[in-house]
Amino acid sequence: MLSPVTAKDKKSFIQWFLNHYRLKKRESVWILNYLVNHSDLLANVHFVRDVKYCPRGIMMTSHCSDEVPFRFYKNHLVTTDAEKSFHDIRLNQNESLYVQLNFRKSNQHSYYASVLEENPFIPEDYYLTTDDKETANGLLDYLLFEQKRNKIIFDIDKALDNGDKELFQKLSEKLEKLSSNRQK
């Protein structure tokens, strides 16, 4: 498990970010500066990807990104009003706030990666495509088939070793039925 990101690291990153990127909404700068100046608040700030899944999150975008300038998410409601979100942040300082910053090549940036945390609210199958699910189901079906087949073959060998023709015949039919069902 990754060690938690310290408030000091978050503060340092935000300051660096503000010095290197220009945000599309000036209110975003106010919010980030507010976070920097309130260290106790930074303990509840978590940098994540896909903030839209979080119960309380904010997405801010720099000019070098094509993403929307600003979004604030709270309990499945979305607003683009940065002042309302700033008010919410000030009033609810003890609640976790999840922050997503959009800027050029953010997914490749090591400094951003150092403060990024795993988003605990992303659905388990979020990163799976339909093809991935079909491939996984096919593999699972194949593995179950192989396990059943190997068990029957093992039991057939055992029946042969024991000279049990009746059990051998029964298991051979079972194996044939299993194989023909697999081919359908």
Curated annotation (Swiss-Prot):
Disulfide bonds: none
Origin superkingdom: Bacteria
Pfam family, one: IDEAL
Family designation: Belongs to the UPF0302 family.
Protein name as catalogued: UPF0302 protein OB1778
Source species of the chain: Oceanobacillus iheyensis (strain DSM 14371 / CIP 107618 / JCM 11309 / KCTC 3954 / HTE831)
